[in-house]
């Protein structure tokens, strides 16, 4: 009888441990999603809203003069996007949440800011200007292409 009690207690302990681990990881996933939402809200308020005021033509003009104040301001705003992209690419932030929030927006933003990005890369060929942002956009593009394939195949 004592053997059955010991086995039952051990099984209950194992199940409790497994449940505790599951709860812990579920909490981590939720915290990561919440951190993504919080970081994106800050990014939107401090950066994306300002970048929305520029057009690709305007960015092209600004990119012609790297000494201009607007060039420096745009570079600083893009640096914040780069920092956010690092968080997404290193899985600190949840890429699925980012896709749901702004996948098309980031693709359009990269396209709009490309003249400035290319200018910075021309000036300093050894530096990695906005590589993480570009990696995020490419990842989003691959995901969108897969989604299109799936929907066109009727799956």
Please tell me what each predicted stretch does.
Residues 71-79, 83-155:
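An amphipathic alpha-helical interaction surface
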């Amino acid at each position: 009888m004592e053997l059955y009690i010991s086995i039952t207690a051990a099984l209950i302990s194992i199940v409790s441990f497994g449940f505790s681990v599951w709860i812990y990881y579920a909490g981590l996933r939720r915290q990561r999603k919440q951190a993504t939402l919080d970081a994106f809200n800050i990014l939107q308020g401090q950066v994306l809203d300002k970048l929305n005021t520029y057009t690709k033509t305007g960015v092209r003009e600004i990119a012609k003069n790297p000494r201009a104040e607007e060039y420096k301001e745009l570079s600083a705003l893009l640096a914040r996007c780069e920092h956010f992209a690092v968080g997404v690419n290193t899985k600190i932030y949840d890429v699925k949440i980012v896709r749901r929030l702004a996948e098309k927006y980031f693709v359009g933003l990269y396209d709009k800011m490309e003249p400035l990005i290319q200018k910075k890369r021309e000036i300093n060929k050894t530096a990695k200007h906005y590589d993480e942002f570009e990696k995020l956009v490419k990842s989003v593009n691959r995901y969108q292409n897969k989604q299109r394939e799936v929907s066109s195949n009727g799956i």
